[in-house]
């Protein structure tokens, strides 16, 4: 028996299928060990003619449906029934695979006896792909000890006998999310599920005019698939507690990432009864005991979806978005919420950390100014206080910066270097946090991972003079989590900055090892017996110009003892 059957459903794929076929022809794996099964859904272009050109390069099976099925399910089923490989790999016609995919997968499967193998995906042309389950290669994972439930597309490798023996095929009557039902069935029936993440093996490509994805799918059709998945989980040959946990995790996924997320705030009011009825049919298939296992903020949504109560369902989603509730209190760090008069209290709802976006970050040798916004926070403005926290990497020292400006939930903090420079030498690295306080509860969030474009090149720094010593302050983004931190270290001025006279009344400061930013404005140079005023301007990231109010002689230039900017003095002698 050959090792693999690569299954490719096609429909009007002439513009991009060559890339896939080339990737299959270039496989670093014996051509006798895999077949390519192409089933065409009545293309009206040159798709099949292009495929036929690969007869001598690939072990091809090609067929065409008599009538267009309107979705990839039927072509995949026809191909699966034809498959002779020990394993099948489903590949969409607009995607392609790494030349080592089949070779590495075969070796991994032989070693670990996998029934389902997830291979690491990479998005191309802005295509989003699941990533969280591909952090590392794992010979065996489950639906509960991994993130595989968050990838239910069929683009994986399956043991053919697993699918055929358990009658796992794509439901052809369903035109939306049918692949999720297929993949969940495979997960539930597999003896071993594995993840191969050594490299990118599957390239998912964003194309224009994709086949089935843009067609309208009614709420009834969509939620019927979700209901069938719930039923499939509940009917699995597993312990009840285990099934309930899997179903709860599926609900977490569904309400977080599917079209259900925020639907009552997006769908037209006149269409919402149709949606809640279909969603309610799905949720009514979920036993109420499972509600206790889902993310706590979903429990009110499950309650009102099961009751098909669109008005209160909408109130919950709107309340979460605004962070405003009919009644609420916080007990032991959790929310107790009543969403409407006469409605039940929902207790013990976790307060998720807010997401913080750094919308601005500017600095010079005088101050650091950063602006932050809070996103997706369950508590509305007016119920919490914010402050910036600088915490030393060794966690021995902490500095707090109060809020300077609140402009429509845009929080600005001014870190005055004159106020904190005496504390900075105590530690080289200072991490930046936003603290959000609600009563006695404090939430701490690192800053910088989400941000607008950073205005400086890497290593751009500020020059600070403290107790006759010079230091540089360098903001940077951490390697692992891409958050902003401040690096503070002593330097030798002559190794870092050059100072030259240009003409008779301009002084040019140039960074030698990196760019240095200075506060623009009034400045002065102090000689042994004179002081000359000037205007400092940043002409580039590593060059500063001081335009003096009068000429200075070269011999006097060599005797400058101090340089004063608006808020910093640099002793040069």
UniProtKB/Swiss-Prot annotation:
Question: Which residues are catalytic?
Answer: 179 (proton acceptor)
Catalysed reaction(s) here are: 4-O-[(D-ribitylphospho)(n)-di{(2R)-glycerylphospho}]-N-acetyl-beta-D-mannosaminyl-(1->4)-N-acetyl-alpha-D-glucosaminyl di-trans,octa-cis-undecaprenyl diphosphate + n UDP-N-acetyl-alpha-D-glucosamine = 4-O-([2-N-acetyl-beta-D-glucosaminyl-1-D-ribitylphospho](n)-di{[2R]-1-glycerylphospho})-N-acetyl-beta-D-mannosaminyl-(1->4)-N-acetyl-alpha-D-glucosaminyl di-trans,octa-cis-undecaprenyl diphosphate + n UDP + n H(+)
Cite the cofactor comment.
Answer: Can also use Mg(2+).
Q: What is the effect of changing residue 92 to A?
A: Loss of activity
What mutagenesis or variant effect is reported for residue 211 to A?
A: Loss of activity
Record's keyword terms, sorted: Antibiotic resistance, Cell wall biogenesis/degradation, Glycosyltransferase, Manganese, Metal-binding, Teichoic acid biosynthesis, Transferase, Virulence
Outcome, altering residue 198 to A: No change in activity
Effect ascribed to mutating residue 213 to A: Severe decrease in activity
Effect seen on changing residue 94 to A: Loss of activity
Co-factor requirement: Mn(2+)
Q: What is the effect of changing residue 76 to A?
A: Loss of activity
Q: Write the Enzyme Commission number(s) for this entry.
A: 2.4.1.355
Q: Where does UDP-N-acetyl-alpha-D-glucosamine bind?
A: 9, 41, 68, 76, 92-94, 127, 178, 207, 211-213
Q: What metabolic or biological pathway is this protein involved in?
A: Cell wall biogenesis; poly(ribitol phosphate) teichoic acid biosynthesis
Q: List the Gene Ontology MF annotations in alphabetical order.
A: hexosyltransferase activity; metal ion binding
- Gene3D superfamilies membership: Spore Coat Polysaccharide Biosynthesis Protein SpsA, Chain A
Q: What Pfam families does the record point to?
A: Glycos_transf_2, TarS_C1, TarS_C2, TarS_linker
Lineage, top-rank taxon, reads Bacteria
Show the InterPro entries listed in the entry: Glyco_trans_2-like (IPR001173), Nucleotide-diphossugar_trans (IPR029044), TarS/TarP_linker (IPR054028), TarS_C1 (IPR041038), TarS_C2 (IPR054531)
Q: What is known of its domains?
A: Contains a trimerization domain, composed of stacked carbohydrate binding modules, connected by a linker region to the catalytic domain. The trimerization domain appears to be dispensable for UDP-GlcNAc hydrolysis activity, but it may increase poly(RboP) binding affinity.
- What other comment is given for this protein? TarS is a unique target for compounds used in combination with beta-lactams to treat MRSA infections.
| UniProt record similarity statement | Belongs to the glycosyltransferase 2 family.
Q: How does it assemble?
A: Homotrimer.
Q: What does this protein do?
A: Attaches beta-O-GlcNAc (beta-O-N-acetyl-D-glucosamine) residues to the C4 position of poly(RboP)-wall teichoic acids (WTAs). Mediates beta-lactam resistance in methicillin resistant Staphylococcus aureus (MRSA) strains.
Indicate what this protein is called per its UniProt record: Poly(ribitol-phosphate) beta-N-acetylglucosaminyltransferase TarS
Organism expressing this protein natively: Staphylococcus aureus (strain Mu50 / ATCC 700699)
Gene that specifies this protein: tarS
